Amino acid sequence: MLPLIKQEDIKPEPDFTIQYRNKIIDTAGCIVISDSEEEQGEEVETRGATASSPSTGSGTPRVTSPTHPLSQMNHPPLPDPLGRPDEDSSSSSSSCSSASDSESESEEMKCSSGGGASVTSSHHGRGGFGGAASSSLLSCGHQSSGGASTGPRKKKSKRISELDNEKVRNIMKDKNTPFCTPNVQTRRGRVKIDEVSRMFRNTNRSLEYKNLPFTIPSMHQVLDEAIKACKTMQVNNKGIQIIYTRNHEVKSEVDAVRCRLGTMCNLALSTPFLMEHTMPVTHPPKVAQRTADACNEGVKAAWSLKELHTHQLCPRSSDYRNMIIHAATPVDLLGALNLCLPLMQKFPKQVMVRIFSTNQGGFMLPIYETATKAYAVGQFEQPTETPPEDLDTLSLAIEAAIQDLRNKSQ
């Protein structure tokens, strides 16, 4: 309820009129209530849905409802603190709304470009009940109660190394390792023992070979070595190595075998890779004697042995390819070997297959251990199912016994 006001406290204003539904109302019994704080230009935050509601598509607040009877009253213009000329209520309200729209758009642009900063803007207008000015608080981005808002966390980019650039000579060049140039004439053809240093000049070319430059074992030797390993029922320390030249025909045949190997079970196949070679050197007898003595003394002496002999020439890679096949069981080792040995028979100088040994480090992945144990145990277990041949023999014996019983009964 409004407090009672004495008649002498009411001061009439001669230029004050109230218009309601296009009718002028007598102001003799009307009281105008105004907020002194809003007249002084201070910001007042409107609260509640009845006081303000954002308009669709813009950030301008609406103070009063147009259906309210007091919203259509004309009140006397209040003095502008900035000294601007007065305008009628309709023009001022329209200009205020348009200005607030433009300001809200500009504030949104600033917020989007500023990374979620909070912006406060106040709009003053003389329309509404008692000429009260309206103010609104615009905020964009995420605000936190504890302080300034933080932007999204940036994901760090991972550095992935390229396999093509992991050659030893490329790494040495990146480390600014100086390379010496051999004092020999560079030419094509076979290399003599006293001119072997010319093979290790600073160049990006590989050592090219039409045929493999080492002794190739026979197929019988490779198969015999594989059978000896399979008799132990454990082939986790054995593997197949394939070495072949870069001839197009040879590569096509090897790729066809690789496709068939990819369909087999219990195999670990490597991608074809190159070998890099360093400068050969003959150690003097003193170095050989110190190494032999350290090995005879035991592990501690061998660990303490420091015999590092270096060179300053550029390593060179050979152009023939290498591939390693690791099998889990003897079944898979012999199956892979049966696919690889025909390559040696077809290309006796360009393809070599051999069996190599490793320590008891296990398989490439632990998923093959179950298959290995099952193979070793399976040789000593009795078959649970009767073979089909035994079933046929048993059925024939039953039929013969039935026929004998019939003959005796007659």
Curated annotation (Swiss-Prot):
Gene that encodes the chain: UL122
Origin: domain of life: Viruses
Compositional bias annotation for Low complexity: 47-67, 90-101, 132-147
Molecular function via GO: DNA binding; zinc ion binding
Alphabetized UniProt keyword annotations: Activator, DNA-binding, Early protein, G0/G1 host cell cycle checkpoint dysregulation by virus, G1/S host cell cycle checkpoint dysregulation by virus, Host-virus interaction, Metal-binding, Modulation of host cell cycle by virus, Transcription, Transcription regulation, Zinc, Zinc-finger
Zinc finger unnamed: from-to: 257-283
GO process terms (BP): regulation of DNA-templated transcription; symbiont-mediated perturbation of host cell cycle G0/G1 transition checkpoint; symbiont-mediated perturbation of host cell cycle G1/S transition checkpoint
Record function comment: Activates the E1.7 promoter. This activation is augmented by the IE1 protein. It down-regulates the transcription of genes under the control of the major IE promoter.
Disordered: region residues: 36-166
Species of the source: Human cytomegalovirus (strain Towne)
Name of the protein described by the UniProt record: 45 kDa immediate-early protein 2
